[in-house]
């Protein structure tokens, strides 16, 4: 699950 920059990625458990 990729979101916009700075958003929290629930499935990834981090930020992109």
Swiss-Prot record:
<keyword id="KW-1064">Adaptive immunity</keyword>
<keyword id="KW-1015">Disulfide bond</keyword>
<keyword id="KW-0356">Hemostasis</keyword>
<keyword id="KW-0391">Immunity</keyword>
<comment type="function">
    <text>Cleaved by the protease thrombin to yield monomers which, together with fibrinogen beta (FGB) and fibrinogen gamma (FGG), polymerize to form an insoluble fibrin matrix. Fibrin has a major function in hemostasis as one of the primary components of blood clots. In addition, functions during the early stages of wound repair to stabilize the lesion and guide cell migration during re-epithelialization. Was originally thought to be essential for platelet aggregation, based on in vitro studies using anticoagulated blood.</text>
</comment>
<dbReference type="GO" id="GO:0005576">
    <property type="term" value="C:extracellular region"/>
</dbReference>
<keyword id="KW-0964">Secreted</keyword>
<comment type="subunit">
    <text>Heterohexamer; disulfide linked. Contains 2 sets of 3 non-identical chains (alpha, beta and gamma). The 2 heterotrimers are in head to head conformation with the N-termini in a small central domain.</text>
</comment>
<protein>
    <recommendedName>
        <fullName>Fibrinogen alpha chain</fullName>
    </recommendedName>
</protein>
<keyword id="KW-0094">Blood coagulation</keyword>
<dbReference type="GO" id="GO:0002250">
    <property type="term" value="P:adaptive immune response"/>
</dbReference>
<dbReference type="GO" id="GO:0007596">
    <property type="term" value="P:blood coagulation"/>
</dbReference>
<keyword id="KW-0175">Coiled coil</keyword>
<dbReference type="GO" id="GO:0045087">
    <property type="term" value="P:innate immune response"/>
</dbReference>
<keyword id="KW-0399">Innate immunity</keyword>
């Amino acid at each position: 699950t990729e979101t916009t920059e700075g958003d929290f990625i629930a499935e990834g458990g981090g930020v992109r």
